[in-house]
């Protein structure tokens, strides 16, 4: 028995020492954004175009993935890390001439999610002019997805979700075609997706979720209708997403996740309540989810990094005013420099206006 006990104590001691070593690493990491590693991480994703199963399994997200990578690079002031011409060529190769939208990958059906990402990649690369004649078709494709009740479907198959509505409204804004949208009908639908707790769900009557809150608040922001929601109740719901460790979760009783640094923060920023959150603790949480060896940011510390969490971690840090990053526009999740150039930027915070 004694031998067993000693072994248990020995193992426990080793684990504690390991944890302490880990802790020192985390403390070091938790103070700086490892820009160089993250840039390399994104560049390597681009080079992984091989026959690996993982690559093909994520083909339906490829356009989104490229946007996440390109936007993160621009926010880290490393836009030149990927070849501009190759990016533009890839985006245009995903255009679906049949429907007028963009697919996630060449010869995939058009979808509103990949259509917005395609437009954003071109905007990030100052290449929207490359759309040429396609521009009108894209606007028609986006408008064709709106239903009678004001909601939007993602493609011709008909599933609706407030994410699709946000993508549609943002895409139209980027293409300067908001005047063609029935704004009031769209706003009415968004308001019907709000809940008594102040949050928003993916459709009427659905549970409040932070990602859907952003899509609704972001769309209302573009449509200049933020005065039509109960901002205080919403802000309280958003602030309650911060867990004791500093991170944010998407709804009550769930684990914290780096991507909510964006969904929650951008929403708070749009209703001018960013200061309601403990920014230092959140910043430490995001930085502690970095992979110091391979680069990239994970959903939470010790997990595997991916481009999605890298983008939203970096964007969250930008909203928190992290030094050395481009300022991000909370409405579009694009650098202010880009939305200003397109004249679609709606300045919320005085500090952004001062830049």
Task: Briefly describe each language-model feature range.
Residues 215, 219-336, 343-344:
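Structured C-terminal portions of repeat-based eukaryotic scaffold domains
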Residues 93-171, 184:
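Extended ligand-binding groove/face enriched in aromatic
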Residues 75-85, 124-136, 174-187, 222-235, ...:
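Structural helix-adjacent loops and short alpha-helical linkers that scaffold large soluble proteins
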Residues 2-114:
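Internal amphipathic alpha-helical repeat/solenoid segments
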Residues 38-57, 93-108, 142-159, 190-211, ...:
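Glycine- and aromatic-rich loop/turn segments at beta-sheet edges
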Residues 348-353:
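Conserved small/polar residues in nucleotide/adenosyl-binding loops
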Residues 28, 32-35, 56-66, 81, ...:
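Alpha-solenoid helical-repeat scaffolds
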Residues 62-73, 111-123, 161-172, 209-221, ...:
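Well-ordered alpha-helical segments within folded domains of soluble proteins
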């Amino acid at each position: 028995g004694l031998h067993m006990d000693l072994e248990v104590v020995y193992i426990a001691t080793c684990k504690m020492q390991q944890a302490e070593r880990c802790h020192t690493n985390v403390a070091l990491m938790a103070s700086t954004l490892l820009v160089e590693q993250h840039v390399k991480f994104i560049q390597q994703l681009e080079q992984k175009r091989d026959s690996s199963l993982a690559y093909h399994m994520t083909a339906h997200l490829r356009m989104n993935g490229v946007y996440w990578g390109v936007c993160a690079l621009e926010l880290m002031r490393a836009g030149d890390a990927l070849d501009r011409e190759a990016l533009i060529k890839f985006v245009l190769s995903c255009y679906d001439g049949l429907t007028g939208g963009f697919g996630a990958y060449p010869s995939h059906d058009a979808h509103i999610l990949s259509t917005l990402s395609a437009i954003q990649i071109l905007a990030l690369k100052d290449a929207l002019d490359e759309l040429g004649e396609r521009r009108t078709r894209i606007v028609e494709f986006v408008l064709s997805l709106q239903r009678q009740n004001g909601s939007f479907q993602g493609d011709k198959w008909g599933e609706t979700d407030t994410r699709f509505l946000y993508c549609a409204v943002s895409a139209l804004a980027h293409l300067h075609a908001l005047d063609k949208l029935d704004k009031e009908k769209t706003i009415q639908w968004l308001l019907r997706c709000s809940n008594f707790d102040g949050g928003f769900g993916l459709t009427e009557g659905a549970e409040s979720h932070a990602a859907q809150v952003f899509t609704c608040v972001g769309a209302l922001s573009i449509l200049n209708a933020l005065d039509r929601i109960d901002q205080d109740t919403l802000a309280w719901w958003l602030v309650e997403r911060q867990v004791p460790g500093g991170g944010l979760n998407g709804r009550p009783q769930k684990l914290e996740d780096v991507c909510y640094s964006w969904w929650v923060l951008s929403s708070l920023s749009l209703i001018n309540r960013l200061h309601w959150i403990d920014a230092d603790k959140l910043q430490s949480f995001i930085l502690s989810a970095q992979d110091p060896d391979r680069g990239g940011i994970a959903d939470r510390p010790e997990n595997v990094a991916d481009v999605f969490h890298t983008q939203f971690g970096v964007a969250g840090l930008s909203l928190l005013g992290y030094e050395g990053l481009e300022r991000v526009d909370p409405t579009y999740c694009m650098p202010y420099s880009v939305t200003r150039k397109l004249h679609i930027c709606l300045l919320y915070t005085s500090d952004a206006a001062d830049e």
